[in-house]
């Protein structure tokens, strides 16, 4: 039976993916959000989903309300619903109920969730009817789907309403310092989540924190080293991607190619292979569809402007920066790697300042954008982007969105734009600069 859903905060990456999925399942979907453009709204607009400014008039009693986690009682629509006792569900609570109708595959972890969810979704949807929610704002819904693949987010323990059949956990790392007190707090959250997985867990076996996880369901370890249950070996990394074999209990279960770069993407693929092997999916089909994976939004997304290679990536944690630069070096071994990074949130920048500097030193040159503050925090003046620049050993400087011309001082470079804020504004400024140079040279 068709329902009408109204999303408060529809441009959020999880919210937009869920909206698209419910729309494709035949439900009427609309939503509201701030007017600022966000990369997720293109998919919503293409689907014909109405995006409204916040207003009490958007809400009618026949609607099911789904509220983004960033929106509280000071939002006029949330306040209206509370005042009139109109029930609503938070995104993660709705998802926890929704997945009960499917055999669900979750992907959790500090880093690599979106890429791994995208890879798992791509393979499974090409084998059988599958619904999915990816953290890049992409969602697909099918009323007949048996399987549901989704991204499981640890922030504020949002994954606690989830009880999936299977879950991958890619790694544990200290992030979200505005919520978690330290690595032990993060690990405890993942341990509580792991206890809710019903059939099997697939965890990276070379992560010391992950090895402390305990759960009633069987735990399968994957990685590169002996002793793991699923081992990736005979690895060849080229400018076309990565080739490798996987063995389980001493037996080779397949030879695989992923058109993706960096060691982290071999691990992501091995996690997907392990999960689908245990779930009884044909490994020959898995190998076929791994070959055709084209990636997810804002994860090593490439474009060429005026013969200049530009990479856009959501990396906003030191571990992710190192992985993204590693991927760029694999694909472009003869080029200078120029990193343009925007720190995301003051709390994360303060907590991980030394680690950010160390990670950015993996690039050949570094440019920094002003820190992007979260809506949840206030700039108390405790950290400036210049503090980060001072700790970077490689050539580095701060640029503004109005003047990105210093980036032109490189002849044979790949430009890697990284961040979770509005780093794309800097990228667009650089693209315009390159386009104008072309016009002036004609």
UniProtKB/Swiss-Prot annotation:
Answer whether the UniProt record assigns the keyword Cell cycle to this protein: yes
Catalytic activity entry: UDP-N-acetyl-alpha-D-muramate + L-alanine + ATP = UDP-N-acetyl-alpha-D-muramoyl-L-alanine + ADP + phosphate + H(+)
The protein's predominant localisation is cytoplasm
Residues involved in ATP binding: 109-115
Which Enzyme Commission numbers does its entry carry?
Answer: 6.3.2.8
GO molecular function of the protein, one example? UDP-N-acetylmuramate-L-alanine ligase activity
Q: Where in the cell is it found?
A: Cytoplasm
Q: Does the keyword Nucleotide-binding apply?
A: yes
Pathway per the UniProt entry: Cell wall biogenesis; peptidoglycan biosynthesis
Swiss-Prot/TrEMBL GO biological process terms: cell division; cell wall organization; peptidoglycan biosynthetic process; regulation of cell shape
What is the protein's known function? Cell wall formation.
Question: What HAMAP family does the entry give?
Answer: MurC
Family the UniProt entry places it in: Belongs to the MurCDEF family.
Q: Output the NCBIfam families linked to this UniProt entry.
A: murC (TIGR01082)
Q: What is this protein called?
A: UDP-N-acetylmuramate--L-alanine ligase
